[in-house]
Amino acid sequence: MSGNPWLQSLESDLEELEAPEQRTPVDRRVDLVPPVAPQPGVVLSRAADRFPRREIYTSLERDTRVWWLGVHGGAGETTLEQLLEGSRAAGHAWPVIAPGEGPAARVVLVARTHARGLRAAQLAAIEWASGDVPVRLEGLVLLADAPGRLPKALKQFSRLVAGGVPRVWELPWVEEWRLGAPVSEDTAPKDVSRLLDHLRTACLVPTSSTNHHPS
């Protein structure tokens, strides 16, 4: 078995979700240092488990400071795009800038905290860690998929996935947005503001007093 817990097979993860009561809960991120770059020895996933790629051609796209890559439908990439000026939803694909056309795109993975979302995030993390994707991964945003606390089995799975990316932000459920309220940092939880502040500093995203609303 690999020394990196997050590199265990997806089958093992599914077994744990199906029968969590048979196992003693453990925090498998103890003493685990999250990777900040692709890791030697990580095997590229099979083709069916890889994400598509979008080539970045226009200057407007190349100037994008942060790309939100939703790893499944409904992950929330377009919602986050509205909250951060200078960012863009990647359309569920790796944004790839041609060699010599500019620095590698900065990417934040986005997933919901249900089992399907966490499995998709794990696949994206493995693909990045293999070194096959020419992007700079900033981290992973885990958006709550429902109100309330995350079930224990999913919480353990989320910790497993978190061990394979540079940084993780966990954002709570926002009922007002679900009911149609404008997506705005002014009405967002503090965890959202902390995420945006970090990216503004790390990725040199301009600060704006203008909020973005759905069209």
Predicted stretch roles:
Residues 105-120, 146-150:
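Conserved Switch II/interswitch segment of TRAFAC-class P-loop GTPases
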Residues 1, 59-63, 99-104, 134-135, ...:
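Flexible, charged surface loops at secondary-structure boundaries
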Residues 92-113, 125-141:
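Inter-motif core of Ras-like GTPase G domains
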Residues 157-185:
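Beta-strand-loop-alpha "switch" segments that mediate conformational coupling across diverse proteins
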Residues 1-65, 197-203, 207-213:
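Extreme N-terminal, non-catalytic leader segments
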Residues 122-165:
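Conserved C-terminal guanine-recognition region of P-loop GTPase G domains, centered on the G4
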Residues 64-88:
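Glycine-rich phosphate-binding P-loop
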Residues 177-215:
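A cross-taxonomic marker for long C-terminal extensions/tails that follow the last structured domain
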